Regions:
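Short, amphipathic alpha-helical interaction segments positioned at domain boundaries
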Residues: 85-113
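Short, solvent-exposed loop/turn segments at secondary-structure junctions
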Residues: 31-32, 82-84
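Short amphipathic alpha-helical interaction segments
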Residues: 50-82, 91-93
Length: 113
């Protein structure tokens, strides 16, 4: 029997059924890459997700921002832009990545391995 970790159960409560389907699709795509480093760097497009699931820009942003909030996905890492001596990172939902936590969360929740 599959063990679901308690913190995973709490996260499941915070996801809509559509978000779960999207995470499944991201996982299936990520799972094709066996190399951990390459898998970590895989990026997904908001535009492609919007087309597949027929989402408006606003709906896609809400979903992606919720996945960021739950630390299941993240914006791609970058060095940002320097303004004077201060650097800041650009925040985007146009392109996003699975976090390692997100990948293992979906793996733990999948019943049909």
């Amino acid at each position: 029997q599959k063990e679901i970790k308690p913190n995973y159960a709490e996260i499941l409560k915070e996801l809509s059924s559509l978000e779960i389907v999207i995470l499944d699709k991201l996982f299936d795509e990520s799972n094709r890459e066996q190399n951990y480093q390459k898998r970590r760097q895989m990026q997904f497009s908001k535009q492609k997700i919007s087309e597949i699931f027929k989402l408006s820009n606003e709906q896609a942003d809400l979903i992606i921002e919720n996945l960021y909030r739950l630390n299941l996905c993240q914006a791609p890492a970058g060095h940002g832009i320097a303004v004077g001596e201060y650097q800041f990172a650009l925040r985007t939902t146009e392109v996003f990545e699975f976090t390692t936590f997100g990948y293992y969360f979906v793996q733990s929740c999948k019943w049909n391995k």
